[in-house]
């Protein structure tokens, strides 16, 4: 299993994960547990569906997540979606990774 460097979204408890594809971008959130992570949400795809709204709804169901953490995660999700939509889908994954060093990119097609 490859070693992943996990960079924080200024949220030591959560990691925003991104699957970077040619025709979609997918977003998910993991919770940091000890030295590992546990999936908190499934992947939500943009533009196939409204990933941002689905992520927001899923995070709101988890009432133990603070509003500040929810907002921070959703703001970063907005940044990723906007970048992918405006220019990122035509750019290499490495460029997205360098632009968003606090996000965990988990793969491509």
Curated annotation (Swiss-Prot):
Gene3D superfamilies: 3.30.390.140. Pfam families: PSRP-3_Ycf65. GO terms for cellular component: ribonucleoprotein complex; ribosome. GO terms for biological process: translation. Keywords: Ribonucleoprotein, Ribosomal protein. InterPro entries: PSRP-3/Ycf65_sf, Ribosomal_PSRP3/Ycf65. It comes from the Bacteria. GO terms for molecular function: structural constituent of ribosome. Belongs to the chloroplast-specific ribosomal protein cS23 family. Probably a ribosomal protein or a ribosome-associated protein. Part of the 30S ribosomal subunit. This is Probable small ribosomal subunit protein cS23.
């Amino acid at each position: 299993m490859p070693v992943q460097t996990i960079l924080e979204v200024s949220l030591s408890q959560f990691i925003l994960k991104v699957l970077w594809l040619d025709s979609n971008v997918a977003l998910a959130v993991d919770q940091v547990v000890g030295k590992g992570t546990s999936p908190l949400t499934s992947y939500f795809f943009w533009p196939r569906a409204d990933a941002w709204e689905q992520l927001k709804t899923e995070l709101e169901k988890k009432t133990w997540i603070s509003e500040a953490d929810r907002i921070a995660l959703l703001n970063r999700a907005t940044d990723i979606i906007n970048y992918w939509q405006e220019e990122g889908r035509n750019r290499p994954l490495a460029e997205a990774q360098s632009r968003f060093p606090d996000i965990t990119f988990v793969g491509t097609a």
